[in-house]
């Protein structure tokens, strides 16, 4: 029975008296998704083999054979010729079996001093480190596209909103720079997350370490890690780094989703602030006139998908005792899907933003509604000596009067403003120059400080952001 089981290919089959059922094989196998780690598995194995040879644990000739075999396997994987087998369960055993078929006993010696527990933890970290670097680069591409659009619209005025009600005029460039700030923080978070990803678990073996005289620091250097995980139990069971990545990815998608929501609103014919290029939109199977902003809508939807992966992995980890448990096999698909979602989203948005057509006349017309310069009038009165709360109340009276007259503050004469302000003997604080603060241009220009919406400040912020890129 033992020899019969051994032919089945399980690395542990000699322990059992009957073969695994086909249903259980399918249920427990991970090869059809974790094969994505194959090239990183080879990278880690080559570094491990080099360490084993350096330490005299295996012969140099065996190391050379392992390298020869792995080089061939890498080529087979890259060309699509490698045959992945369900019976071999996962990426690690598939590669090891092929290596042994190619180089014989040298391949059987590769697993000396390690376990699949520390092996897979190493593979995931190598893969995730690479993906983080790609995501940081894509965030840079998107920020660059936003900066270009912001620079073109540093003077374009639109209404700023709170509660989706007109609040104060801002420039479109300033509005876009808010997203540059968000995506800059996202890049910083990813870079910080990378620091904790970039620790080597290999050498922890199954959970307790190994009795072989290994050199973990050598392997860490070979693989570009900043150092080693300091506790073997934690090294094989830790998925904090994966959860942290999913949290950072969720914030990226949060910011994409907020931007998407605004794009959808701005593109609505009822608003008409922008148009999105046709190649990022779809039509309707029944309504011939439709041009739907499907890309931002779908990005908004995919954000919930990424949130789900974060919640799923947190739930996966919350009840596990030390050390490694089979539950952890479920850590990979959420990571893989999140990376694919974030990468595709950032690529598409970096391509979509340069093609956004801005409609400044519509933006300006909207900013002229809703008393967007009311705060400027209050500030005008404060600068003439009125306490802010009194100024606030006076302007509120004026706004109410404008509501009744169906006009804007700027439409009232100086005398009318004095009359409706309710200021009584202080109404003379409203001078003949009052209309200068009720213009959109005057309003945005007055916010001329770091972080303000004045065009000069927007251009300075753009220059600083370009330098940071």
UniProtKB/Swiss-Prot annotation:
Protein's organism: Cupriavidus metallidurans (strain ATCC 43123 / DSM 2839 / NBRC 102507 / CH34) (Ralstonia metallidurans)
PROSITE patterns: FUMARATE_LYASES
The keyword Amino-acid biosynthesis is assigned to this record: yes
Alphabetized NCBIfam families for the sequence: argH
Family in the record: Belongs to the lyase 1 family. Argininosuccinate lyase subfamily.
Gene Ontology MF annotations: argininosuccinate lyase activity
Protein name in the entry: Argininosuccinate lyase
Taxonomic placement: Bacteria, Pseudomonadati, Pseudomonadota, Betaproteobacteria, Burkholderiales
Single GO BP term: arginine biosynthetic process via ornithine
């Amino acid at each position: 029975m033992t020899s019969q089981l051994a032919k089945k290919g399980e690395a542990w089959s000699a322990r059992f008296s009957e073969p695994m059922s086909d249903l259980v094989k399918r249920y427990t196998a991970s090869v059809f998704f974790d094969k994505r780690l194959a090239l990183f598995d080879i990278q880690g194995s080559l570094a491990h083999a080099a360490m084993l040879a350096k330490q005299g644990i295996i012969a140099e000739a065996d190391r050379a054979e392992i390298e020869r075999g792995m080089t061939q396997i890498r080529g087979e994987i890259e060309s699509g010729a490698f045959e992945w087998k369900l019976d071999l369960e996962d990426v690690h055993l598939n590669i090891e079996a092929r290596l042994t078929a190619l180089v014989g006993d040298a391949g059987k010696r590769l697993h000396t001093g390690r376990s699949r527990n520390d092996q897979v933890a190493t593979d995931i970290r190598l893969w995730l480190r690479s993906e983080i670097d790609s995501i940081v680069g894509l965030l840079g591409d998107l920020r660059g596209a936003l900066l270009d659009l912001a620079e073109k619209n540093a003077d374009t005025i639109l209404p700023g909103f709170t509660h989706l009600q007109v609040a104060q005029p801002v420039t479109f460039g300033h509005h876009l720079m808010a997203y540059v700030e968000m995506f800059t923080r996202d890049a910083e978070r990813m870079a910080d997350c990378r620091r904790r990803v970039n620790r080597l678990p290999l050498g922890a073996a199954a959970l307790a370490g190994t009795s072989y005289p290994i050199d973990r620091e050598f392997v860490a250097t070979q693989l570009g890690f900043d150092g080693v995980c300091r506790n073997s139990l934690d090294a094989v069971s830790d998925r904090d780094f994966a959860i942290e990545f999913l949290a950072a990815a969720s914030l990226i998608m949060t910011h994409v989703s907020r931007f998407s929501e605004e794009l959808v609103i701005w593109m609505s014919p009822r608003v008409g602030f922008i148009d999105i290029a046709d190649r990022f939109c779809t039509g309707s199977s029944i309504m011939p006139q439709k041009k739907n902003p499907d890309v931002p809508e779908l990005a908004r939807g995919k954000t919930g998908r990424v949130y789900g992966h974060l919640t799923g992995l947190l739930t996966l980890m919350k009840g596990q005792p030390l050390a490694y448990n089979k539950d952890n096999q479920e850590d990979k698909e959420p990571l893989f899907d999140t990376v694919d979602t974030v990468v595709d989203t950032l690529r598409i948005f970096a391509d979509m933003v340069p093609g956004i057509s801005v409609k400044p006349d519509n933006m300006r017309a909207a900013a002229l509604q809703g008393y967007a310069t009311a705060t400027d009038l209050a500030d005008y009165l404060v600068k003439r000596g009125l306490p802010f709360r009194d100024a606030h109340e006076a302007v509120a009276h004026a706004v109410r009067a404008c509501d009744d007259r169906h006009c804007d503050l700027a439409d009232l004469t100086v005398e009318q403003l004095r009359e409706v302000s309710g200021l009584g003997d202080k109404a003379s604080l409203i001078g003949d120059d009052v209309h200068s603060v009720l213009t959109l241009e005057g309003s945005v220009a007055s916010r001329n400080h770091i972080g303000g919406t004045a065009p000069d400040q927007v251009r300075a912020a753009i220059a600083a952001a370009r330098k940071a890129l």
